């Protein structure tokens, strides 16, 4: 999760987020090189007193400063396109989670099992335990099994919302009258935090998302307990 004074990306909990982190580092390296070269050229131009009165054109240098940016853009575009198609792919999901955005809470349905659905509201400050986080904790967490391909179907009941979990590298828009889908595969157990990422009204800031990733045995126990109750 995001922590105080943290300027880095959150720890990746899915292969998608790992790929996004590597692409971020790849792009940042290229930008650092460009910034360094441009800074060096600007400093050289301001400090160099030499001139060339006979320079009318330079075909070679024009070819270089046209070709190098084109090659640089290719090195950025290819991994970017690869990631875009990778995020859109949904390969043989093992279960489906339905998400419905409301003002200002989330509803969840486990459509592979009967009668498992609930609403998830943010916990008010006066109900928080000592180990819970303000504005991020909810009354009903979403339990999901780790190392399983999960399809997310998402829509909204009123206005635009967006279901986002930064550590999973997922952000899916919830649009009224439209069903969007995405895919996640959590690769470690733990508690993952997210928030609504589309301004949806006065209480937009109070729509947290909490996912609890557990081993498949614990998940099945929770399913059986929910069905029996």
From Swiss-Prot:
One Gene Ontology biological process: ATP synthesis coupled electron transport
Key word Magnesium present: yes
Binding annotation for Mg(2+): 198
EC number: 7.1.1.9
Pfam families, alphabetized: COX2 (PF00116), COX2_TM (PF02790)
Cofactor: Cu cation
Superkingdom as given in the UniProt entry: Eukaryota
Topology with respect to the bilayer: Multi-pass membrane protein
Parts of the chain on the Mitochondrial intermembrane side: 1-26, 83-229
Function: Component of the cytochrome c oxidase, the last enzyme in the mitochondrial electron transport chain which drives oxidative phosphorylation. The respiratory chain contains 3 multisubunit complexes succinate dehydrogenase (complex II, CII), ubiquinol-cytochrome c oxidoreductase (cytochrome b-c1 complex, complex III, CIII) and cytochrome c oxidase (complex IV, CIV), that cooperate to transfer electrons derived from NADH and succinate to molecular oxygen, creating an electrochemical gradient over the inner membrane that drives transmembrane transport and the ATP synthase.
Entry's family note: Belongs to the cytochrome c oxidase subunit 2 family.
Quaternary structure and partners: Component of the cytochrome c oxidase (complex IV, CIV), a multisubunit enzyme composed of a catalytic core of 3 subunits and several supernumerary subunits. The complex exists as a monomer or a dimer and forms supercomplexes (SCs) in the inner mitochondrial membrane with ubiquinol-cytochrome c oxidoreductase (cytochrome b-c1 complex, complex III, CIII).
Protein name: Cytochrome c oxidase subunit 2
Name of the gene: COII
């Amino acid at each position: 999760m995001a922590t105080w004074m943290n300027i880095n990306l959150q720890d990746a909990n899915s292969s998608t987020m790992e790929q996004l982190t590597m692409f971020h580092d790849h792009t940042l390296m290229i930008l650092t090189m460009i910034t360094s070269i441009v800074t060096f050229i600007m400093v050289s131009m301001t400090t160099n007193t030499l001139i060339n009165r006979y320079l009318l054109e330079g075909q070679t240098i024009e070819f270089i400063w046209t070709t190098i940016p084109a090659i640089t853009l290719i090195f950025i575009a290819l991994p970017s396109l690869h990631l875009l198609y990778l995020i859109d792919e949904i390969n043989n999901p093992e279960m489906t989670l339905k998400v419905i955005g409301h003002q200002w809470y989330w509803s969840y349905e486990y459509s592979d099992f009967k009668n498992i659905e609930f609403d998830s509201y943010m916990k008010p400050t006066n109900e928080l335990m000592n180990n819970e986080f303000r504005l991020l904790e909810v009354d009903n967490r979403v339990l999901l099994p780790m190392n399983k391909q999960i399809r997310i179907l998402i829509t909204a009941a009123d206005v635009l919302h967006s279901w986002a979990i930064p550590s999973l590298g997922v952000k899916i828009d919830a649009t009224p009258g439209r069903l969007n889908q995405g895919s996640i595969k959590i690769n470690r157990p733990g508690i993952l935090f997210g928030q609504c990422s589309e301004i949806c009204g006065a209480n937009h800031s109070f729509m947290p998302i909490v996912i609890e990733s557990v081993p498949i045995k614990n998940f099945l126990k929770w399913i059986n307990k929910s069905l029996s109750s």
